[in-house]
Amino acid sequence: MARSSPYLRQLQGPLLPPRDLVEEDDDYLNDDVEEDEESVFIDAEELCSGGVKAGSLPGCLRVSICDENTQETCKVFGRFPITGAWWRVKVQVKPVVGSRSYQYQVQGFPSYFLQSDMSPPNQKHICALFLKECEVSSDDVNKFLTWVKEVSNYKNLNFENLRETLRTFHKETGRKDQKQPTQNGQEELFLDNEMSLPLENTIPFRNVMTALQFPKIMEFLPVLLPRHFKWIIGSGSKEMLKEIEEILGTHPWKLGFSKITYREWKLLRCEASWIAFCQCESLLQLMTDLEKNALIMYSRLKQICREDGHTYVEVNDLTLTLSNHMSFHAASESLKFLKDIGVVTYEKSCVFPYDLYHAERAIAFSICDLMKKPPWHLCVDVEKVLASIHTTKPENSSDDALNESKPDEVRLENPVDVVDTQDNGDHIWTNGENEINAEISEVQLDQDQVEVPLDRDQVAALEMICSNPVTVISGKGGCGKTTIVSRLFKHIEQLEEREVKKACEDFEQDQNASEEWITFTEQSQLEADKAIEVLLTAPTGKAAGLLRQKTGLHAYTLCQVNYSFYSWTQTMMTTNKPWKFSSVRVLVVDEGSLVSVGIFKSVLNLLCEHSKLSKLIILGDIRQLPSIEPGNLLKDLFETLKSRNCAIELKTNHRAESQLIVDNATRISRRQFPKFDAELNISDNPTLPISIQDKTFIFVRLPEEDASSQSSKTNHHSCLYSAVKTLLQENNLQNAKTSQFIAFRRQDCDLINDCCCKHYTGHLTKDHQSRLVFGIGDKICCTRNAYLSDLLPENISGSQQNNDLDASSEDFSGTLPDFAKNKRDFESNVRLCNGEIFFITNDVTDVTFGKRRSLTINNMAGLEVTVDFKKLMKYCRIKHAWARTIHTFQGSEEQTVVYVVGKAGRQHWQHVYTAVTRGRCRVYVIAEESQLRNAIMKNSFPRKTRLKHFLQSKLSSSGAPPADFPSPRKSSGDSGGPSTPSASPLPVVTDHAMTNDVTWSEASSPDERTLTFAERWQLSSPDGVDTDDDLPKSRASKRTCGVNDDESPSKIFMVGESPQVSSRLQNLRLNNLIPRQLFKPTDNQET
């Protein structure tokens, strides 16, 4: 990789576009290019409000700049939103050593100045280039330039009179072409004033005209608002441009706050950073000290929340950190200024960024409203549900593993239902308990199988789900969180299918059955497209894929749910179809520790307002690293709800092969050194002992190093490379498809990938120009989400792609047109997700129509597709993936995991805990013992959040009682265990039956829970991009939370709620009870 010098230089002069466009195409292979982070999360309601979402950063180009001060022509590599020889730019650059294609790399973004006089004496050449860029034919360009030379002089030609000159040229040449002169003077006047030339609609022409009218926009907006700049100058109205130009000359500080930019121009998450303002000295001179201090304080507040994960900062701490920039009085005034413009919120000497404050409050309000709704009990025998798990194939068996990217949703053919008093009275979930239990009693263990003792924690967890509107389940990998939840809803699905089928068969046998009766098969076919009622979600694409694979049900990312609502609002007027998730009654969120409060707030609010949501289930591990974004959602909800019997921890490991891994994870959470069942010392000539072949938790000990030694870093890399090379000879690491290296630092990942690439494929990860190299056999991962339809080669044949999709073709049914439609839907709906791992199985370069390279990639879960290599790099930004950082691999798991500790540095026990729990069967830890001990002993940095406080306050004020369980009854064989409903043939009146005439809209209070969009405006994400895990201020290094208790949370003691104090008595209405009936009575029957 090219080494860069910290010395910065300012270049100013004409911008010359790249000459060699073919060579430019390879720039996407450079690994040292500044990463373009995906746009920040945007709330669906913000998008629906008509706001303009930020675009991506401009692409990187190689250009030449002729410096006006030294007359030197410098080759520069960086992000230039517009190019052309008629522009002058001013930009900060740093020298780059080791690159043959460019001398300097841009720091930040350029300012643009139009050469309105076309830079004499080059007017002719610049004008020709400009007209060519404006899609004017070469003949017309030559005719125009000849005419200019005859009529006037090139010296008089400039951009200010170019439009009029072109109009005059077209008018005069038009007269010559006409046989008869214009007969009406008014017609001539019309031609002079109203004639619109075709080139006036081209982007280069509009940019030039904008620069003439609004020079400040061209100078400052590319630096201040690089993601919005091109949209503003290309699509923004003249009024908007005029207002922004005026603000840049009077109150530029307003561009530093997204709330103001949204209010004025509907720009979403659009605000300039303080660092960007510092590059515009003339703008700083227009600001008062108060305005500058407010921008500094706002920037510091966002930085603290981003790096430490806080959702608020105490006033004293904030002012203290700014003591070197402003006095205490100035800080107080700045804070008041920020509060007055609505950017921050005060509460008890705490300062919140408004978006985080609103997110935590909105979550608390939504959860409280769910808990106040009339209770909905799933009347199932949870012990028999759990017992049925042991009589079926394991969820993770190869036979049951589903394609993570199948297009067709694996829906319930007769989806589960809940109490809906308006139109769903006959569904099985709303029937009396006697009907449910009668069917459940049919589920029995096979006689030749030994009954497995049930996990009482799992029993209690399922009872919570059946009884409570909100349930939080925490536990380590292998405790069965996902298994029991998916099994519960599959069980209910089977019961409903069985009852519907039996009822249909009985009715068909009736002699009086109508000829119009639809058979069970036909009915099932009609209901195949029934709406989703149990929605499984995860925070990342990879986690959603694993959830889909484990459960056999379709799973979505939270962002997909959010954006699907926006997409629906754009088409609902024409399609007249309901929102895809409008029938959701149960929301399951897996990997809850990774969920940010902003995304969760948005999705929960959408489902509460626009679906029939009645149950929320959150799964995760409270000891894992929290979200990389501010907040600590899972831990806050768990600690708040456990006292109300709505949260529980599963403590028993159900993977026999991973017991030692689970035990060591517990030790690590208690800051104790783990117990290894094998050790391997790395020396000059390490050999792999046979004794570790059947071990589970292996310590690969690196030699201790002297930190003061100059060769310490070199020795560490040498020892690490030797350790990795040695382990690659081990049987469990022979297959890269079932093993994964994990490291904390990205530089360690690079070294491991180099070693693995050479071992598995025989080539290096980079060439002599530090460009990434990919080939057959490479293990790669996507670092961005992208749809398959955006990645397909332009000239791919239908038959070829159909063959690639054979693994999923069983989901395509019907006629050939139906198949074609399904195929298009497949390509449009399938996403390659951030974090998803693929293997390259084929690499073809087609030179027929230019150099086009295609890769065939396989995710080893049923999806194999051929994609365009350049598109794959552009949209997915693929990287080698034999080694991943712990933060990017969190939410995934593998059979064998190798964790490289490296230097302890900022690592603490949660990093080690999260890493080792990624392994299902075997874990290797490569580390110096002292560094491993330091990391385990280091406490995590507690996050300051207010979700717990908001939720406790809201629940207390609303009088929501602790959860209780229906029909309490001690189960056989465990007098002290959790209760389960009895399988009684007699009907049992349950709470949901008593509230049959209470609609959900009456039970909730949306006006109390939700604010208007204007009131809950969210700010932009923190400024700056930090993508390297080993940087001092990496966001990932601060992903901590305050799990300080060494022991696991105590088991929940379930106590039945006293009817005397139950607020649910207010909802009991005995006067409207209606007996449950499968079919409506005829006129002569009693009602």
Swiss-Prot record:
Q: Where is this motif: Nuclear export signal?
A: 1055-1078
- Modified residue annotations for Phosphothreonine: 1027
The record's CDD domains line, in alphabetical order, gives: DEXSc_RecD-like, SF1_C_RecD
Q: Among its keywords, does the record have Nucleus?
A: yes
Q: Which GO terms describe its biological process?
A: DNA damage response; DNA repair; DNA replication; DNA replication, synthesis of primer; negative regulation of double-strand break repair via homologous recombination; regulation of DNA double-strand break processing
Q: Where is this region: Disordered?
A: 953-989, 1015-1051
Entry GO MF terms: 5'-3' DNA helicase activity; ATP binding; ATP hydrolysis activity; protein-containing complex binding; single-stranded DNA helicase activity
Subcellular locations according to the entry: Nucleus; Cytoplasm; Chromosome
The primary site where this protein sits is nucleus
Tissues in which the protein is found: Highly expressed in testis and thymus and weakly in liver, spleen, kidney and brain.
Q: Which family does it belong to?
A: Belongs to the RecD family. HELB subfamily.
The function of this protein is: 5'-3' DNA helicase involved in DNA damage response by acting as an inhibitor of DNA end resection. Recruitment to single-stranded DNA (ssDNA) following DNA damage leads to inhibit the nucleases catalyzing resection, such as EXO1, BLM and DNA2, possibly via the 5'-3' ssDNA translocase activity of HELB. As cells approach S phase, DNA end resection is promoted by the nuclear export of HELB following phosphorylation. Acts independently of TP53BP1. Unwinds duplex DNA with 5'-3' polarity. Has single-strand DNA-dependent ATPase and DNA helicase activities. Prefers ATP and dATP as substrates.
- Protein name in UniProt: DNA helicase B
Organism of origin is: Homo sapiens (Human)
Q: What lineage is on file?
A: Eukaryota, Metazoa, Chordata, Craniata, Vertebrata
Q: Which gene encodes it?
A: HELB
